[in-house]
Amino acid sequence: MQFFIIGTDTNVGKTIVSSWLCLHTAYDYFKMIQTGSINGTDSDILKKLTYSKIHKEAYCYKEPLSPHLAAKLEQDEININNIILPNASNLVIEGAGGLLVPINQQYLLLDIISYLMLPVILVTHSRLGTINHTLLTLQALKSKGIEVVGVIVNGKPNQDNCDAITWYGKTTILAQFPFLSTITKTTLRNIPLTQELKQLFIV
């Protein structure tokens, strides 16, 4: 299976959740578009936290900006026809920023996901505002006919928020991923996959 991991925003925990999933499932990892490489890449993080095969990014830019701006600074433009998925049966693909982040002058990240038509796992935060952010993202995905297999909520557990997202978003909470003060292979390994995730990833 191949799953697209996207977030309701930047810095909601896509990379840590991707690391957790890859560590437990041995899935390959592919960061489609990387910005901010001057500060290190998400692929570098996966190399430290997992044993997975890491595939080279389709596009990688230095500045931590929206992909269309980061590319422009380097006199480049992202061509979605050049984004070719790795030949891997079991693959976690991580998006860049939020769903409506511009990729170039024509396309948003949503358009790429719609073109690929892969099932999506949505990562969101547990703090105030998550219900609105998550429901808007779910609505945008569903408007394009994209399959959302469920939501992973990252941060301090908040069952009320999870219940609201489940009810109004007509979706499934696949896991509540806890806040970790230290992130290592060991701390990630100590958080077991939920039964829902085991069934999805067939582990």
UniProtKB/Swiss-Prot annotation:
One of its GO terms (molecular function) is magnesium ion binding. It is an enzyme of class 6 (ligase). Its cofactor is Mg(2+). The active site is at K31. Belongs to the dethiobiotin synthetase family. Homodimer. This is ATP-dependent dethiobiotin synthetase BioD. The lineage of its organism: Bacteria, Pseudomonadati, Thermodesulfobacteriota, Desulfovibrionia, Desulfovibrionales. The gene is bioD.
